[in-house]
């Protein structure tokens, strides 16, 4: 759906170039949203995810240092705990994918071709994508802008993405996560899409480190 051009001569209104650019960009964004919405209706006809509301167990949404502290944490405290949680998290999400009958290492296909992640590097998306720890600069920026300087609220230093092909796979992973009892927050953007129409689901899950300290990690479901 091409964005309509502004017709100054028809309306007789002199539109400032900045305003005209803003309007055109808004129309393009809206056209993109309509395409995304149409794609979602095509690929998610049963709307299974609509049954799940967002929720948050705020009393458990706080990181701890490896010595058990939850107050006055530094970024180093959080990253040290994240490093300890990472191997346990990796094993947990691989088992999760396999329990949903997904091959964690399978290459994701789009229109019959591997879905490219980085063309220059020649990398493609796999069913399970486990990222490195969130970078220090981004952690500091997010803590400053979103959490008032409280590093203990960083819940996605350890994270992964699971990419599915079907609505049945989507609901299978969701059910396994929720039935596991370790989800402390769900942001269900399949039900509550972003203004662009983009949809996914973000699960904050508790992982226990080898020393027994809980660490909150993120599973992104696409």
Q: Model segments located where?
A:
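Charge-rich, low-complexity segments
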Residues: 1-154, 171
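Long beta-strand-rich cores associated with HINT superfamily self-processing modules
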Residues: 143-222
């Amino acid at each position: 759906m091409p964005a309509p051009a502004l017709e100054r001569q028809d309306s007789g209104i002199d539109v400032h170039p900045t305003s005209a650019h803003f309007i055109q960009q808004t129309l393009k964004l809206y056209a993109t949203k309509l395409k995304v919405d149409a794609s979602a209706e095509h690929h998610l006809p049963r709307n299974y995810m609509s049954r799940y509301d967002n929720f948050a167990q705020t009393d458990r949404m706080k990181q701890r240092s490896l010595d058990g502290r939850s107050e006055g944490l530094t970024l180093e405290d959080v990253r040290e705990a994240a490093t300890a949680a990472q191997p346990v998290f990796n094993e947990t999400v691989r088992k999760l994918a396999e329990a949903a009958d997904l091959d964690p290492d399978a290459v994701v296909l789009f229109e019959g071709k591997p879905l490219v992640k980085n063309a220059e590097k020649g990398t493609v998306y796999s069913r399970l994508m486990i990222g490195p720890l969130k970078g220090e600069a981004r952690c500091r920026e997010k803590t400053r802008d979103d959490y008032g300087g409280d590093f203990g609220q960083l819940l996605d230093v350890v994270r992964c993405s699971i990419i599915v092909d079907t609505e049945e796979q989507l609901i299978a992973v969701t059910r396994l996560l929720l039935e596991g009892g370790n989800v402390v927050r769900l942001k269900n953007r399949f039900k509550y899409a972003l203004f662009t129409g983009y949809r996914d689901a973000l699960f904050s899950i508790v992982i226990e480190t080898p020393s027994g300290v809980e660490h909150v990690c993120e599973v992104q479901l696409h």
